[in-house]
């Protein structure tokens, strides 16, 4: 599974870029907001979400872990797939989404092409309580994602442990939330080991 790509932007389409990594061009789909920040010929590091299906392998790229995590979170809503998740992230930042959900503002989602009244309502209802704003101003996924083994207190202890191991607090928070989303049943020991392994692998 590809978790990160670093290379130069070779070309760009309406909803994708070709990123050249050591002479190999990877087609990576991205939101409009991400595409707007990329320039051909420039070097970037992209966080990658890999979707493997029988008929294809698709890569989705993000400049921040925050956007990647919201890409996955949006797909937890019934009726939202990868294309719709990217469409929403093309119109709204993760912070915009968090504010709209907490304010139960369905209209902001209805304004997005392809999002009707029923889907907008599901987004608010199904995601309310799953996002929380932390003091630093970034957005994290709350522990309501069926996390069985990691309590909020334990999560904070893991973050502290990672900071002591050389992570910045922001890196530790993003690492913990990303791993927990992918594996809600992970133990604390495995969570720390996975965070260290991912960092050493450049993920």
From Swiss-Prot:
Residues covered by region (Domain II): 64-142
Superkingdom classification of source: Bacteria
Region (Flexible linker) location: 143-149
Keywords for the protein's UniProt record, in alphabetical order: Cytoplasm, DNA damage, DNA recombination, DNA repair, DNA-binding
Region annotated Domain III, chain positions: 150-203
Positions of region (Domain I): 1-63
UniProt xrefs under CDD domains: UBA_RuvA_C (cd14332)
GO biological process, one term: DNA repair
Subcellular location: Cytoplasm
Main localization (coarse): cytoplasm
Record carries keyword Phosphoprotein: no
GO cellular component term, pick one: cytoplasm
GO function term, MF aspect, one: four-way junction helicase activity
Similarity annotation: Belongs to the RuvA family.
HAMAP family reported in the protein's UniProt record: DNA_HJ_migration_RuvA
Domain characteristics, as noted in the entry: Has three domains with a flexible linker between the domains II and III and assumes an 'L' shape. Domain III is highly mobile and contacts RuvB.
Subunit structure: Homotetramer. Forms an RuvA(8)-RuvB(12)-Holliday junction (HJ) complex. HJ DNA is sandwiched between 2 RuvA tetramers; dsDNA enters through RuvA and exits via RuvB. An RuvB hexamer assembles on each DNA strand where it exits the tetramer. Each RuvB hexamer is contacted by two RuvA subunits (via domain III) on 2 adjacent RuvB subunits; this complex drives branch migration. In the full resolvosome a probable DNA-RuvA(4)-RuvB(12)-RuvC(2) complex forms which resolves the HJ.
Function: The RuvA-RuvB-RuvC complex processes Holliday junction (HJ) DNA during genetic recombination and DNA repair, while the RuvA-RuvB complex plays an important role in the rescue of blocked DNA replication forks via replication fork reversal (RFR). RuvA specifically binds to HJ cruciform DNA, conferring on it an open structure. The RuvB hexamer acts as an ATP-dependent pump, pulling dsDNA into and through the RuvAB complex. HJ branch migration allows RuvC to scan DNA until it finds its consensus sequence, where it cleaves and resolves the cruciform DNA.
Protein name stated in the entry: Holliday junction branch migration complex subunit RuvA
Organism, as annotated: Rickettsia felis (strain ATCC VR-1525 / URRWXCal2)
Encoding gene (name): ruvA
